[in-house]
């Protein structure tokens, strides 16, 4: 079975796909929003230029681009192996797990470079299988971190060590109806942290937000983006008739003020490989040499069990190989682009103004991307790509079910009610790759319709256009999303 999987991951299907264009005529929807003449670039099959793959399988996210050859291919495979390797708590090679952690490998949460089923729908809290496929971020209500816990509650621990806390999830449901009478349901999850390692934290002084893993689709292209183009999008991202006004999140990464691109709130300027190994798995490295529970009794308990915390768990070269692996992943091509239902759905996507934030076309800078060790990847440069994102942050509202998507968590300039526009490329294969259709930052949306109907704030007008479509038009828009 292992060899079959490897063959499937290496196999690529090449095809010639024609590009076509069609026009959406000017119209006015039921909310009075005027949709101007827009050229709908139907047929954007080559999602990532020369980094596009044509796989339609469970490994569609987990393949190198065609230009990954020679020593790059060797390093890609080494990085892939480290990404999927199950860490243990011993002192040997590929050990170093814990003492507390959230997942035991990158692949435990990002299965096949995608997103493992959220704990919200699997274990309804801290998992019993050594990982929970979620991160629990906490702060005081004044924004400060708790001394005993830092920014993340690690709900898993190695043998003999107590987790920092456990999470219980309860869900509230509410049924709504489209104007044509068709019902839809939204789920609002509520999180409770119990079994605290140290002093219990009063809910009155606690902000808690949960993140499920992101798909690792198009990471290299994101890092190669023309930053000036993104800043220009922010400068002109002002559509008062739609209530849309996106902006950049600037953060300090590696001591330099940079444009944030990665993460739910665009809170990172690189792929944060070392941070993931440290914060998620407790695996120390040259950037994060201290254990994540430094100062807690867990460190002493581990030492008493014969574990050593004096040497790093991961070498710099290993981190660089994982960084290269993530940069070199290819992006699945669009499928069924000539299907009439998909074409109609693409028209509905534009009619609803979805393209104003989920920007169809962007470009990478001439020099491509640069790895942690300074290695240049020029093959990522000068590419026309179709991520369906502006990589800007937008107010997503607080009004739905009394809470909306506001999690009160501030990241750089990004406020609690603001989120980065999620890149949609590859999203139509998530069911095939990961076996579920859970979307949004904590997986509360169980399908495309629920994800759309959770849009508030700057997404409210577009949501209302979708809401007032006919059932046929809504179904067509969903078919278009499945094609991405």
How would you label these PLM feature ranges?
Residues 59-97, 321-350, 364, 369, ...:
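Electrostatic cytochrome c docking/interface patches
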Residues 24-48:
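Bacterial Sec-dependent N-terminal signal peptides
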Residues 54-55, 61-75, 85-319:
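Extracytoplasmic redox metalloprotein regions
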Residues 186, 197, 201, 208-209, ...:
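C-terminal accessory segments of proteins
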Residues 101-113, 216, 322, 345, ...:
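The canonical Cys-X-X-Cys-His
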Residues 73, 112-115, 156-193, 312-334, ...:
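C-terminal capping alpha-helices of c-type cytochrome domains
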Residues 6-15:
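Bacterial N-terminal signal peptides that target proteins for export
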Residues 16-23:
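Bacterial N-terminal signal peptides
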């Amino acid at each position: 079975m292992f060899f079959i999987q490897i063959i499937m991951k290496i196999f690529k299907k090449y095809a010639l796909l024609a590009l076509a264009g069609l026009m959406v005529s000017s119209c006015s929807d039921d909310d009075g929003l005027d949709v101007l003449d827009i050229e709908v670039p139907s047929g954007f099959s080559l999602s990532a230029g020369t980094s596009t793959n044509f796989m339609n399988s469970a490994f569609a996210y987990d393949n190198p681009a065609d230009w990954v050859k020679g020593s790059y291919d060797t390093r890609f495979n080494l990085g892939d192996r480290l990404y999927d390797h199950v860490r243990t708590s011993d002192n040997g090679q590929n050990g170093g797990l814990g003492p507390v952690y959230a997942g035991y490998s990158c692949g435990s949460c990002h299965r096949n470079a995608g997103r493992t089923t959220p704990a919200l729908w699997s274990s309804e809290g801290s998992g019993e299988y050594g990982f929970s496929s979620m991160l629990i971020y906490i702060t005081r209500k004044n924004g400060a971190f708790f001394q005993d816990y830092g920014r993340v509650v690690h709900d898993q621990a190695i043998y003999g060590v107590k987790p920092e806390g456990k999470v219980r999830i309860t869900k509230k449901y509410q049924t709504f109806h489209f104007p044509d009478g068709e019902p839809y349901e939204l789920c609002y999850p509520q999180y409770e942290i119990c079994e605290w390692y140290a002093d219990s934290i009063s809910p009155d002084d606690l902000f808690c937000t949960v993140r499920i893993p992101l798909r690792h689709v198009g990471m290299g292209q994101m890092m190669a983006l023309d930053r000036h183009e993104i800043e220009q999008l922010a400068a002109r991202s002002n559509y008062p008739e739609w209530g849309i006004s996106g902006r950049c999140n600037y953060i300090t990464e590696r001591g330099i003020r940079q444009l944030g691109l990665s993460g739910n709130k665009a809170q990172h300027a690189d792929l944060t490989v070392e941070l993931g190994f440290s914060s998620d798995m407790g695996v120390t490295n040259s950037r994060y040499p201290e254990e994540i529970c430094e100062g807690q009794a867990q460190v002493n308990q581990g030492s008493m069990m014969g574990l050593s915390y004096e040497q790093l768990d991961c070498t710099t070269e290993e981190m660089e190989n994982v960084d290269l692996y993530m940069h070199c992943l290819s992006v699945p091509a669009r499928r069924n682009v000539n299907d009439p239902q998909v074409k109609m759905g693409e028209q509905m996507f534009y009619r609803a103004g979805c393209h104003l934030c989920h920007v169809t076309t962007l470009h990478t800078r001439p020099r491509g991307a640069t790895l942690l060790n300074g290695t240049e990847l020029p093959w990522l440069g000068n590419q026309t790509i179709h991520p369906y994102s502006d990589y800007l942050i937008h107010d997503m509202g607080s009004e739905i079910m009394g809470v909306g998507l506001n999690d009160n968590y501030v990241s750089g300039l990004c406020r609690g009610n603001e989120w980065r526009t999620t890149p949609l490329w590859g999203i139509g294969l998530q069911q095939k790759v990961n076996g579920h259709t859970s979307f949004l930052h904590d997986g509360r949306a169980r399908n495309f319709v629920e994800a759309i109907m959770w849009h508030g704030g700057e997404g409210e007008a577009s949501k209302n256009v979708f809401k007032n479509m006919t059932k046929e038009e809504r179904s067509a828009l969903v078919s278009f999303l499945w094609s991405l």
